[in-house]
Every structure is written in structure tokens, then in C-alpha cells.
Amino acid sequence: MNILLANPRGFCAGVDRAISIVELALEIHGAPIYVRHEVVHNRFVVDGLKAKGAVFVEELDEVPDDAIVIFSAHGVSQEVRQEAKRRGLKVFDATCPLVTKVHMQVARASKKGTKAILIGHEGHPEVIGTMGQYDNQDAGIFLVESVEDIAKLPVSSQDDLTFMTQTTLSIDDTSDVIEALKEKYPAIQGPRKNDICYATTNRQQAVRELAKQSQLVLVVGSKNSSNSNRLAELASRMGVPSKLIDGPQDIDPSWLDGVETIGITAGASAPEVLVQSVVEHLKTLGVTGVSNLEGCEENMVFEVPKELRIHEVK
């Protein structure tokens, strides 16, 4: 029985940046540092930051006056930003720059009075933050998750209409939704390039290749990680059994019955240490060989805020 590791896999530039912001803030200012929502959706990462002194909260009313707060990689609404400013909280923004790019698209649409349609998953923090960039009461922003949702849209005119997407969606599903939107609203405008981020795209492409050569695909990632769920769904859609796991403790040995090659990948918020712990555990269950699938190389780096960057250089 062999393991085939997907490439690329694991941390993306936005996740690296978000974790660095929390770690540098703790190093410079000391504990506690408050973080609004899990800075990235991974239990192992969050528990590690908690151990260093990060305090994770869901709302700003849980943050004491004069405290430091970090916004998670998923971004926040304008309302949350304004509340932090009103209270005089010191803020470090760990919003992924690619999410910020979508925020700017929504804010521009709001300012121009253009109706906006966001393709995304209801209730996901990124979607909540993105929807919260739109405040034009005379137009509106609407959320769709599927092709079926388009028929329910309360939008009759295609004039002054635009769309954007959550950054961690299924490429295939999103393509279908965009096609259906353009069919119903031929004049609808959208971004020149898909809003789905490079890391999501690359990891989904790697899983396509992985599934072709595996009888089981294990995706290392937490249950609340959107991009990790999409990887598991993609492998299943290709006819290969797939399991989303937080780590080796989640593996059921019965999954390996009749399997010759186990494909392993990791969501963009899952650290490589978890992948390696899964590999080592599988070796105790009969794996004898480990190889890497060829894939694209990622060199993207996002800088941390200037105040933290200056300290980092020193």
C-alpha cells in the first residue's frame, strides 16, 4: 500500500500571513491578543495560538476596552470595522488580500448603486463579511449558492447588475452558477478574472490528478473549512471515496481495505505537520511507500501590516 501526496497542498499565502499576524502581535504586545473568529479554520492551528495567549471571540463585545483585536483571514463587515473604530480598539487586520479584493468590488458596486449578486455559502464568515461591504439601500446585494437559487432572485432588470464570488468555492459548481446567471441576465457584469483564489484553484486541480491515481483520498482539514470540504467533494464526485480528517486520530483502518494507493492532500488552512502525522500513522497500518505528485509551485507571499513588519525586520 502506497501514499501519493498532492502538490500543492496545505497553507496558502493568506493563511501564512494571518497566522504570522497573530504570532507577531503576541510577540510584540504580549498576551492576551483577541482574535475575532478563528483566524483560520483549523482546530490544530487555533489551539496552538490559544496556547501562546490568543483569545478567540465571535463578537467585539467580548473584547475589553483598550485591548488589541485581530480580524480573521475571512474578513469582516464594515459594521464591525466601524464598531472597533468607535471603541478605539487597536486593530490588526488579517483579512486575506484576495478577500479584500472582493470586498472592494462590492464596495464599488454599492457606491455606484449597482445591484450585486454574491455567489457563496450562506453563513460562512467570508460571505458575511463580503455582504457587509454593501450599504446602498436603494439597490441591494443578493446571495446565491446554486443554480436553483437564481430562479428565486428578486431581480427583474439586468441593467446595473454585477456578480462576484466567495474565494473558496468549487470551481465547477461556480462555473455552472455563473453560466446560469449570464443566461438569465445577459448584460450582467463580473470580474475580469474569477474571484476564486489561486490556492483554491491549484488545490482542486491537484485533487483531480490525485483522484485519477488513488482508491481513497484523505483531505486533512477541519470540518468548518470551506476549501477543505470542496476538495473532499471533488474527489467523491470523481468516483473516489474521500474522507475529511483533522488528523490521524480520525482514520478508520477499515477505509484501507482493498486500497493500493492512498491520495493525501490538505486544505489551505491545514499545516504540513498534520499531513506528516497522517503519513506516519498510515505507515503503522501497512503503508510502505510515499511519493509526491508533480504540481505547480506557489511563490505567493502577502506582507503583514507595516507595524508588525518593521518589528519582524529588526
Curated annotation (Swiss-Prot):
Binds 1 [4Fe-4S] cluster per subunit. Its cofactor is [4Fe-4S] cluster. The keyword Oxidoreductase applies. Pfam families: LYTB. InterPro entries: LytB/IspH (IPR003451). The active site is at residue 126. The keyword Cytoplasm does not apply. Dimethylallyl diphosphate binds at residues 41, 74, 124, 225-227, 269. (2E)-4-hydroxy-3-methylbut-2-enyl diphosphate binds at residues 41, 74, 124, 167, 225-227, 269. One of its GO terms (molecular function) is 4-hydroxy-3-methylbut-2-enyl diphosphate reductase activity. Isopentenyl diphosphate binds at residues 41, 74, 124, 225-227, 269. It catalyses: isopentenyl diphosphate + 2 oxidized [2Fe-2S]-[ferredoxin] + H2O = (2E)-4-hydroxy-3-methylbut-2-enyl diphosphate + 2 reduced [2Fe-2S]-[ferredoxin] + 2 H(+); dimethylallyl diphosphate + 2 oxidized [2Fe-2S]-[ferredoxin] + H2O = (2E)-4-hydroxy-3-methylbut-2-enyl diphosphate + 2 reduced [2Fe-2S]-[ferredoxin] + 2 H(+). [4Fe-4S] cluster binds at residues 12, 96, 197. Catalyzes the conversion of 1-hydroxy-2-methyl-2-(E)-butenyl 4-diphosphate (HMBPP) into a mixture of isopentenyl diphosphate (IPP) and dimethylallyl diphosphate (DMAPP). Acts in the terminal step of the DOXP/MEP pathway for isoprenoid precursor biosynthesis. This is 4-hydroxy-3-methylbut-2-enyl diphosphate reductase. The lineage of its organism: Bacteria, Pseudomonadati, Pseudomonadota, Gammaproteobacteria, Pasteurellales.
